[in-house]
């Protein structure tokens, strides 16, 4: 994930960019994380498939979320250290009190196919990580670390006061951690709550997660993807770039409450997903939900996916509820309350990632049994599609500045659009055929005659004044 977590990482990035400026070459692969035992080598920057933006590093660090693939190398599982190590064995432990104080040392490490059951224990961590990549990708310096092993955790209290000290970290496709009744509090930077990489999995329930540092998402995945599945969570993050959820893998949250006072609600990067159900989450900075691709190598190229059902999402910033850049993305909403300070529902545009003039977005928003409000915008190299399905009602304008490369809308018979400003659509489809479920409110919706041959260039009067007319 892209945000650079430490001063060392900023220095490394600055050097890399200086080389790029003077030589035209970005020394990207020279500082990737080394693979941990049983894990693939860290991905290098990929060429995107046809139809997606070409990637190049921007002149600055990526935005809110997680840090990226510049910096020192990671370590193999055999090189990692901890106050307590279970190495290829099966153990059941209870009532431990462990305090790891040395740099790069975890409190508890299970590795090499080990299996541990740990209950009723307190683990704490001080002492910074010496390598951002090692802590971000292979879990160095985490409070509890599972590397290609299994762990069952219950009734634990985990605290850290160090940079690069994630709480529970699962790395490797053979790593699975189950956790129940866990309390987590991390105080410094790059110290997330639950974090998985390289196909690792965490399944957690009844978790209480507080993070205070920068780049400390409560629920996270990093390089090589990972899976984090959580039920019943209480989340509080306060640092810059520390959303409630940051995914370069697959993250599911059911029955959760949370606030990110220094960041967005949630971020998906690349071909990855966030699935929310019965949650109440609030973000305070920049946007509500961010869907993007940085091309740092941490997230595969493809469609970013976000869904929320039976939930409440509150965006306290003045930015859009959905911000999409440099990727193809889809969001699906059902019976979810959206609360926001600003007047923009969606903005699909170019940002600081990707290649100039090829770094727009392509976004589809699907809504069922849903109330939506706000304008939908896209720039001249971006496409946006709104699908209003049964019992979806939207009050807003589509492409009111007539800037989008494409702006499309479809409505089922039981959907409705309350138009708030003149709008310009590329294609429009409506099950009613007479567009009686579009309330014009005196505004004109212009459609592309060439892209809507079935409308034959006709003008249709809309309810409450206004019209649908060819352009």
Q: Where are the predicted features?
A:
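Disordered, low-complexity segments in secreted/periplasmic proteins that are enriched in proline
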Residues: 32-77
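Transmembrane beta-barrel domains of bacterial outer-membrane proteins
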Residues: 100-109
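Bacterial Sec-dependent N-terminal signal peptides
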Residues: 1-18
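Feature marking well-ordered beta-strand scaffolds used for ligand recognition
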Residues: 74, 133-135
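Cys/His-rich zinc-coordinating modules
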Residues: 417
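C-terminal segment of classical bacterial N-terminal signal peptides
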Residues: 22-32
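Surface-exposed loop/turn motifs in large extracellular/passenger domains
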Residues: 80-95, 110-128, 139-160, 169-187, ...
């Amino acid at each position: 994930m892209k945000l650079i977590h430490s001063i060392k990482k900023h220095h490394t990035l600055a050097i890399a960019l200086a080389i790029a400026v003077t030589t035209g070459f970005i020394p990207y692969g020279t500082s990737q994380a080394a693979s941990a035992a049983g894990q693939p080598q860290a991905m290098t920057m990929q060429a995107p498939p046809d139809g997606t933006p070409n990637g190049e590093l921007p002149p600055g660090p990526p935005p809110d979320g997680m840090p990226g693939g510049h910096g020192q190398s990671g370590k193999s599982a055999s090189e990692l250290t901890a106050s307590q190590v279970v190495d290829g064995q099966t153990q059941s432990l209870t009532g431990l009190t462990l305090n790891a104080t040395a740099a790069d040392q975890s409190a508890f490490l299970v590795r090499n196919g080990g299996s541990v059951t740990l209950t009723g224990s307190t683990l704490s961590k001080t002492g910074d990580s010496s390598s951002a990549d090692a802590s971000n990708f292979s879990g160095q310096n985490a409070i509890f670390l599972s590397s290609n092993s299994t762990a069952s955790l219950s009734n634990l209290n985990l605290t850290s006061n160090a940079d690069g000290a994630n709480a529970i970290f699962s790395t490797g496709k053979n790593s699975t951690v189950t956790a129940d009744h866990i309390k987590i509090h991390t105080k410094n930077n790059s110290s997330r709550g639950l974090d998985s990489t390289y196909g690792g999995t965490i399944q957690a329930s009844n978790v209480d997660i507080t993070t205070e540092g920068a780049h400390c998402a409560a629920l996270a995945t990093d390089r090589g993807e990972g899976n984090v599945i959580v039920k019943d969570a209480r989340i509080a993050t306060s640092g810059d770039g520390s959303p409630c959820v940051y995914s370069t893998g697959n993250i599911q949250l059911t029955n959760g409450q949370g606030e990110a006072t220094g960041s967005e609600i949630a971020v998906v990067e690349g071909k990855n997903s966030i699935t929310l159900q019965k949650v109440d989450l609030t973000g305070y900075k920049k946007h509500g939900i961010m869907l993007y691709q940085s091309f740092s190598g941490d997230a595969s190229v493809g469609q970013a996916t976000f869904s929320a059902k039976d939930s409440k999402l509150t965006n306290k910033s003045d930015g859009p509820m959905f911000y999409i850049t440099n990727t193809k993305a889809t969001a699906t909403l059902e019976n979810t309350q959206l609360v926001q300070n600003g007047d923009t529902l969606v903005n699909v545009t170019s940002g600081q990632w990707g290649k100039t003039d090829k770094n727009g977005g392509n976004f589809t928003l699907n809504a069922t049994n849903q109330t939506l409000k706000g304008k939908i915008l896209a720039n001249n190299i971006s496409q946006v599609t709104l699908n209003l399905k049964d019992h979806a009602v939207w009050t807003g304008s589509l492409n009111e500045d007539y800037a989008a490369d494409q702006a499309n809308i479809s409505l089922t018979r039981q959907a409705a659009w309350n138009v708030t400003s003149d709008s310009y659509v590329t294609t429009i489809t409506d099950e009613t055929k007479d567009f009686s479920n579009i309330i014009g409110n005196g505004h004109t919706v212009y459609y592309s005659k060439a892209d809507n041959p079935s409308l034959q260039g006709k003008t249709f009067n809309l309810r409450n004044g206004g019209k649908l007319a060819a352009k």
